[in-house]
Amino acid sequence: MKDPRHPATDEIALTRVLAALSDPVRLGVVRLLADGGERGWGELRAPVAKSTLSHHMKVLRDAGITRTRQEGTRCYVRLRRADLDDRFPDLLPAVLAAAGADDVGAEVTAAP
């Protein structure tokens, strides 16, 4: 995998962010990454095929929600919280609170 393109902060569009967050699996990934940590793709557990999870990760990255980096053969992902907060103040906390209250995306976990 070559280095993926990430949109600059001012290129992050609200419509793309909201569309990306409308899927329960993608919202679950965001909930998992909300602790501020970075996770290897191999650590993510979701009720979808690996190829489908890879697609979800691309949608999140292309929307500007996550940042992916490659180290050797491993890929790591983290939430672009500061960029999202700069662009859309209070959006992410509101979405995370609502998702937590409704338990949306809870099936996405990290490997122990």
Please place each PLM-identified region on the residue numbering.
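Amphipathic alpha-helical dimerization/coiled-coil segments
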Residues: M1-A13, R31, D35, R80-P112
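N-terminal helix-turn-helix DNA-binding core of bacterial DNA-binding proteins
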Residues: I12-A49, E71-D83
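Intrinsic disorder/low-complexity signature
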Residues: A20, T52-L53, G100
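Conserved acidic functional residues
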Residues: D23, H56, P89
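Secondary-structure transition/capping residues
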Residues: G40-W41, H55, V95, A106
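Canonical helix-turn-helix DNA-binding module
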Residues: W41-I65
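Short beta-strand His + acidic residue motifs that chelate non-heme Fe in jelly-roll/DSBH
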Residues: R67-R69
